[in-house]
Amino acid sequence: MSYNISLDSLPYFESTYNEEDRSAAAQIVEEELKRSGGLLIKQEEQKKKFQSHRLSDRLENAIVAAGKGEKLAAIDVQRYIQLKPPGTRESLLQSAVVWEYQKSRNDNLYLLEKHGEKAFDSSLEALEVQLELLEKELVNTKKLSQGCNRKRKHYQMEVGARLAEAEVKFGQLLQSSIQCRVATLLS
């Protein structure tokens, strides 16, 4: 009864293992397990027991290579590093536009720092002057409105008096008209 036992290797071991030494070490481990009453777990069972998710092919290949004692291949990061910036016309134009924008922003910040307080004070004074002008216009409009209301009240009173006179005259005319009709009917 022979079990396939793989020995772990050190991850940074530079050379490959000798196959004779590997098989001798595997035999020693197997004999020791039998003597001590330990159980050997088959690799398939071990994978099922300790691996709840599937590893990628690249990672499985790296594990197999490490088990064989091969040196792990490092990731080639040189393809991800650009040593030179892109020199396309569009990128140069875009960087010039951004530089101009940053330059004008820097100038604006400098002007704001140097003259911002004065500009705010003068703007505040201008707002106060406008407030005073609005208050004066409000007072003038209120006076005009009051004058207009006085005139309207005066004309309404005058028209009211005329209307009262007209109603009295109309009542008298109506009364005389009725008296005339009654007199003509009686005669």
Curated annotation (Swiss-Prot):
Pfam families, per this entry? BCAS2 (PF05700)
Q: Where in the cell is it found?
A: Nucleus
This protein's superkingdom? Eukaryota
Q: Which InterPro entries match?
A: SPF27
Q: Which controlled-vocabulary keywords does the entry list?
A: mRNA processing, mRNA splicing, Nucleus, Spliceosome
Q: Could you tell me the Gene Ontology terms of the biological process aspect for this record?
A: mRNA cis splicing, via spliceosome
- Choose one Gene Ontology CC annotation of this protein and give it: spliceosomal complex
Q: How does it assemble?
A: Belongs to the 40S cdc5-associated complex (or cwf complex), a spliceosome sub-complex reminiscent of a late-stage spliceosome composed of the U2, U5 and U6 snRNAs and at least brr2, cdc5, cwf2/prp3, cwf3/syf1, cwf4/syf3, cwf5/ecm2, spp42/cwf6, cwf7/spf27, cwf8, cwf9, cwf10, cwf11, cwf12, prp45/cwf13, cwf14, cwf15, cwf16, cwf17, cwf18, cwf19, cwf20, cwf21, cwf22, cwf23, cwf24, cwf25, cwf26, cyp7/cwf27, cwf28, cwf29/ist3, lea1, msl1, prp5/cwf1, prp10, prp12/sap130, prp17, prp22, sap61, sap62, sap114, sap145, slu7, smb1, smd1, smd3, smf1, smg1 and syf2.
Entry function: Involved in mRNA splicing.
**Membership in a protein family:** Belongs to the SPF27 family.
- Its recorded name reads Pre-mRNA-splicing factor cwf7
Q: Lineage from the top down? A: Eukaryota, Fungi, Dikarya, Ascomycota, Taphrinomycotina
